[in-house]
């Protein structure tokens, strides 16, 4: 009886991976040990050492992302400060008033009451009788807050004011005109 020669091709019937170790190893990308920076502190430690020497590898979290709402407030503060700087350069603000307003990113009704005389003398507010008229947009402020005491009658033109600020100004005999 003649024996058949042994087959050269073994088809691995019944085997899951057919002699290739893992199912991932037959997908055409080689045995890479993970994608990207996988294993840089383990089996690819030399890659980490080389990249770290060049300064190309950062591990962990870095930096800080400011929340968007704070960015908006920061931009508003910057706009106020730029407007105040411009008014000072034009000669419309004296040093005291400039420093007073520059140190306050938001304007309270009490602060406005303290400084309204100076603003009137500098031409940034008008005084008719005992009523002061001021447009806070000229100073760069878009909102009036309600802290402090209000003793003078003021007619304030502003984009937005808190209910407490409106209440205090109206209690002193003035009014708030919201644009």
UniProtKB/Swiss-Prot annotation:
Highest taxon of the lineage: Archaea
Record's keyword terms, sorted: Ribonucleoprotein, Ribosomal protein, RNA-binding, rRNA-binding
Gene Ontology biological process: translation
SUPFAM superfamilies: Ribosomal proteins L15p and L18e
PROSITE patterns, alphabetized: RIBOSOMAL_L15 (PS00475)
Alphabetized PANTHER family for the sequence: 60S RIBOSOMAL PROTEIN L27A, LARGE RIBOSOMAL SUBUNIT PROTEIN UL15
Role played: Binds to the 23S rRNA.
Name of the featured protein: Large ribosomal subunit protein uL15
Organism of derivation: Archaeoglobus fulgidus (strain ATCC 49558 / DSM 4304 / JCM 9628 / NBRC 100126 / VC-16)
Name of the gene this protein is made from: rpl15
């Amino acid at each position: 009886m003649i024996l058949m020669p042994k087959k050269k091709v073994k088809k691995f019937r019944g085997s899951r991976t057919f002699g290739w170790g893992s199912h991932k190893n037959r997908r055409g990308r080689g045995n890479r040990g993970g994608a990207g920076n996988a294993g840089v502190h383990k089996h690819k430690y030399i890659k980490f050492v080389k990249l770290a020497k060049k300064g190309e590898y950062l591990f962990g979290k870095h930096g800080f992302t400011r929340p968007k709402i704070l960015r908006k407030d920061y931009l508003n503060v910057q706009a106020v400060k730029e407007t105040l700087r411009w008014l000072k350069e034009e000669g419309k603000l004296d040093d005291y008033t400039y420093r007073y307003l520059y140190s306050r990113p938001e304007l309270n009704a009490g602060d406005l009451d303290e400084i309204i005389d100076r603003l009137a003398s500098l031409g940034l507010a008008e005084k008719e009788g005992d009523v002061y008229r001021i447009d806070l947009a000229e100073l760069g402020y878009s909102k009036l807050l309600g802290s402090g005491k209000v003793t003078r009658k003021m007619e304030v033109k502003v984009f937005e004011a808190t209910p407490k600020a409106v209440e205090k100004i109206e209690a002193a005999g003035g009014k708030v005109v919201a644009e």
